[in-house]
Amino acid sequence: MKKTILSLATFAAIGFAGSAQAAKVDICVFDLLGKSGESYQMAQEWALAAKGWGAEINLIPRQDEAVADNDFKAGKCDGVFMTAMRARQYNKFAGSIDALGGAPSNAIAQRAITFALDQRNAAKMVSNLGGKKYEVAGIAPLGSAFIFVKDKKIDSIEKAAGKKFAVLGYDEAQKIMVQRVGAQAVVSDVSNFVAKFNNGQVDMVGAPAYAYKPLEIYKGLGTNGAMFNFPVLQVTADFIIRPDQFPAGFGQKSRDWFVKHLPKSIAMINRLEAGIPAKYKLNLSAEDKTKYQKLLREGRMDMTKRGIYDAGMMSVLKKARCSVDKANFECSLSGE
């Protein structure tokens, strides 16, 4: 009897030890600058914290976003950090924070991301595609995207007609919106869209301040270029995982970590935006700003009807916008 009890106790102890071992997982991290980039460095901080949630993280840097996504699809990674525009295929709710004009300031983006990652939205963070389960385990802001032009004479959207505009090929919203203003959409990838601007293949490009120095946008601007000082959309990165490869409750702990680090990320973005030389910044009149807001609103509502954006997230973003700017024309309108 004593031997039996001893055997059971030993078995239980072994079982407990096995369950206490950290789950070893591979995470692909897209960063154009590889290990030296800000996104990869943030992932390193996150990986250290993840040890406390029962996961042993192996980070795999990827400088090509398509490769990171394909590696995730092929099962070479258990999770992937990539831009929300590409991650939208896994979760439309989280991926729609990047909607055109959806979060026109970093403060609004912070509110929207905080709400999305809150525990009350945990169910919306999980999706099932093709019999496979995915979960959004984090959202990180990369900052507002601004339009850069090679010639400052292109000082209005009307003057963009006929001009070549680099767009990310996998984001239908960009292509549709560029065509709506009469410009020519030049299909590109995140690895070459700024290069096309710098070498003169396109006249216009949209990018966050985050990309200004690393991608050398100043080369494309030269002495005659400009930046519309008007945020077109908020660029974010999503962290997508296969939850069955991680300890129970991991996703929410990870999301809480991202929320905690939002102020630090927003402060960094504000510094980067302030760092763009004033000589390039083209300030718009209040009248033009309202006109462009209306244009983006119409485009956003159209994209939602087409199924590109998530209607629930559009409602979240509108509430965030109107909580910051209650006097905005759209706050008294229905439709989102």
Q: What do the predicted segments below correspond to?
A:
Residues A23-W53, K133-N199, D203:
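Bilobed "Venus flytrap"/periplasmic-binding protein-like clamshell domains
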Residues I27-R111:
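Extracytoplasmic small-molecule ligand-binding "clamshell" domains
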